[in-house]
Amino acid sequence: MERKNIITIGLALLVFAGCGYKQQRTGISETGRGEDYLPEHIHLISTTPVKDQGNSELCWAYGMLATIESEHIMKGDSVNLSIAYIARMMLEEQAMEYYFAQGKKNISLRGTAPMLIHYIDKYGAQPYDSYEDPKHINYKVLCRKVQKLCDGAISKKAGISQLKEELNDLFDAEIGYMPAKSVHMLGAEYTPQEFAHSVCYPEEYVSLTSFSHHPYREYFALEIPDNRMHDAYLNLPLDELMLHIRKAVEKGHPVCWEGDISEPGFKAPQKNCVDIQPMERPVTQASRQKEFEQLRTTDDHVMEIIGTFMKGKQRFYVCRNSWGKNWGNKGLIYLSEDYLRLKTIAVSMSEEAYLYDRSVRLVVPYSSPKDSINLLSIYNKV
């Protein structure tokens, strides 16, 4: 994700490099602040333990994997997936591309939530306990080591067999030895691909956005730097997008959120509640579009939305971050609905969450515009 300025949260100084940050920090949850803003009666979607991405740029993978995990927990199926395995497969793939491009490509772990679906469909998945992310690893340094290794292979015209062998030695030393080729779960044996398909099929999730420079209720490749695979997002009017988010969360489904965290409210949240400045209201489709076109809304970070609550007349969404439990309220932060309206780049959710009301025909992935309806016409009925 894109590099941002130093962000102050309470007394903590967090330095972002994309969606990562330096490890040295203190979390405001240590003082207990913020819990007054999370009503006791609120139902939070069950999740796996909060993880810490360190200074890596893998927030997109953390956020999307967390969403997949929570979706399964909702259905009574506990699953905890390995980030390190995805990072290793991604780096190996990029190394091959870099070699054949003779160094005219870059090696980076930046990405978007839909990319995670592509990677687990292609390479499979591993349980978290089988290939746990080592806490000491610096993925930015590892990317530079991979590039240096590839440059050497290019200069020697070594071929990909030798390059793969050297890469595996590097990854084994830096990340850890790969687990067995088979995944063992509940007495059954799977290949990594079979295991991945048991937790997520490619068509199981839909990605949504809302920008007026493309037709509504059609798919388009979102113009953000990290959309490296040119994934297509379903474009909805802003009110419809927000309705999908709210109804999904209220029905117990997690939502993967991608958006901008450069707002002043995010830099200094009051008791972990992040709002936008008053002069930004009301947030309309036009004001949101202006922020995006003037490059003030950028694709900075990915989190998982796991709950919602009202504070006075303002709705907030509870987001699970990937900066460890010592950040925010035990790893959680609350974004106002206005913040989401203005600063959301895109969201991803299961198709089941997207089709929250099966009595109504909604826009389904890759349907034609004539099959779609205006959700605002049923807004007061749900």
Where on the chain are the PLM-derived regions?
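N-terminal regions that are enriched for targeting/export leaders
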Residues: 24-45
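Solvent-exposed loop/turn segments at secondary-structure junctions
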Residues: 66-67, 92-94, 127, 136, ...
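Active-site nucleophilic cysteine motif
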Residues: 54-68, 107-114, 301
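Sec-dependent signal peptide recognition
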Residues: 4-10
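C-terminal motif of bacterial Sec signal peptides marking the signal peptidase cleavage site
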Residues: 17-18
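Papain-like cysteine protease catalytic cores
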Residues: 83-189
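Active-site signature of cysteine proteases
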Residues: 43, 165-382
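Second-shell loop/turn segments in exported
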Residues: 45-57, 100-108, 228-235, 244-245, ...
